[in-house]
Amino acid sequence: MPVTVFAGPDALRLALRLQSPGDYVVASNWNGPGSVVIEPDVAHRTRQCPCCAIRLDLVDGLLRAARRARRPRRILLVADPSDDLTTMTYTLLSDADLARHVRLDGVVMAVDAVAAATRIAAPGLLGNELELDALAVADAIVLGRSGELTTDGFGRLVSALRDVNQVGHVCAPALSARGDDRPDDDVVMGLDAWHGAPTVSTAGPSVSRRDRDDVPDTVVLRQAAPLDPDAIDEWLTWLVDTHARRLLRMQGALAVVSASARVCCHGVRSFAMSHSEAADPVTSRRDDSLVIVVGHGLDVDELSSGFAATRAR
C-alpha cells in the first residue's frame, strides 16, 4: 500500500485537498473522517543513538490504517512542522512490520510561495533546519499561492528551491489551466520515488552547500562503466557507517559486472537496502551508474574519489 508523506507548514491542508474516497490521512493534528491520529513517540534501537531513532506511533498508526476491514487505497501521512522527517522516512523504510504492509511512495513538500519568496528576498533561508532537510529530499514541491508572484519573483523562488533540492520537481498548480492550488494526483502521488533509479534535476556532477552548515548538501555521482561488486559493496558500507548521523537520503542504480540488471539501492541514516532493477519496469541492461547522497557536511571530493575507485578494472 503506497504511503505519501506530506511535509511543510501547509502539509495538512494539501493532504486534505488531495484526499479521495478510500484514502486514509494519518496525522497528529487531524481527527476527521478517514483518519488515524498519532502522537509522536520516539524510541532508539540502540540506546541514545540518533541515527537509529524510530517513531513507534508511526508504526502503530500506519498498521492500524493498513489493517482496516476496508483496506485503504493509499495513506496520506502528514508530518507536523516540529517532526523530524528523516526519522519518519527511516521508520517507513527500516521497520520490518511496516515493510510487509506499506511502501514509501514519495515525499511531498507544501510551500507557501508568497511567504517563501518574502523570506529569500530579505534575504534569508527558505525555512528552518527541519524544513530544509525535508525540502532537500522532497520528490515533489507544491507551491501554494504561486499565482500571486511576479514572473521574476517566481523565477527567483524556483532557483532558490533548486539550490536545495536536486531530486524532485516543482509544481505550481495555480499557474495551470485550472488555476487553483490543487495539484493533479499523478503529479504528487503514485511516484514510487524511493525504490528505483533516482531522478536528478541537475546535469552537473554534484551540488554542494559548503557555505552553510544548516543547508543540506546534495552530491550526485556518476560512472559510465560497470562497477566491481566487492568494491561498490565496500563503498556503500563505508558511506552508511561513516555518514549515518547526517545521511538524509541515499539512492542509486548501479551497473555491477556480475549482475544481469542494475542494482538499485536506497537508504537513510543507518539503514540501507538493495534490490535488482529487474523488479522494476525498466529491465534492460545498462552500464551507467548513478548515486545521489543528501546530507549535512558531505565531502564532495571524498565521495567522488571513493565512488570512482569502484570501477571494475
Question: Predicted segment positions?
Answer:
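Residue-level signature of catalytic and energy-coupling elements of molecular machines
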Residues: 58, 107, 232, 293
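N-terminal phosphate/diphosphate-binding loop that engages ATP/GTP or pyrophosphate donors
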Residues: 9-73, 80-83, 87
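Phosphate/Mg2+-binding loops and adjacent switch elements
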Residues: 60, 68-173, 178-179
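Non-catalytic terminal/linker segments enriched in charged/polar, low-complexity residues
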Residues: 4, 16-20, 310
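An anion-binding loop in the catalytic cleft
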Residues: 281-299, 305
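C-terminal accessory "lid"/substrate-recognition subdomains
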Residues: 130-279, 298-300, 310-313
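A short, charged/proline- and glycine-enriched loop
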Residues: 1-3, 214, 287-289
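Short hydrophobic/aromatic beta-strand immediately N-terminal to the Walker A/P-loop
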Residues: 3-7, 76
